[in-house]
Amino acid sequence: MNLNEVISNIAHTLEGKKLIDSNKTLKPNDDVNKSQSSNDSFPTAMHIAAFKLVKENVIPALESFHKTLIAKEKEFEKDVKIGRTHLMDATPLTLGQEFSGYASQIKHGLKSLRNSIDHLSELAIGGTAVGTGLNTSPNWDTTVAKYIADETHK
């Protein structure tokens, strides 16, 4: 668990000590790894990161993009062009209709992203190696989940 060693070493240097010092205050396995496993902490960290990115950045950007496409749909509702399919000319349509198709795709993508938020809110923390919670303190999972919820405003 290299990450535990990295975290321990960072804490050690933040205390003003050198990495070559053998007496480390924060031990990689006894302190950093306490009550968790890479099988629950990494998926939990990934869910938190994805949750924040999707909710705070991706969804707002796509909502703005969707509004722009709707505006373009109206702006070009009377501009007729040739539709294309299979690299060939097809039937006429308006440029507004084409933008409508793009807007529809973004709308469906937004719906899928919003649905994913609930799934990303499910955390593996506290499950340890095989999901049993073995070697964790009582209520570890709920305590950590509450802290994460408070920090992420979820």
Place the predicted regions along the sequence by residue:
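Conserved, well-structured ligand/cofactor-binding cores
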Residues: M1-K154
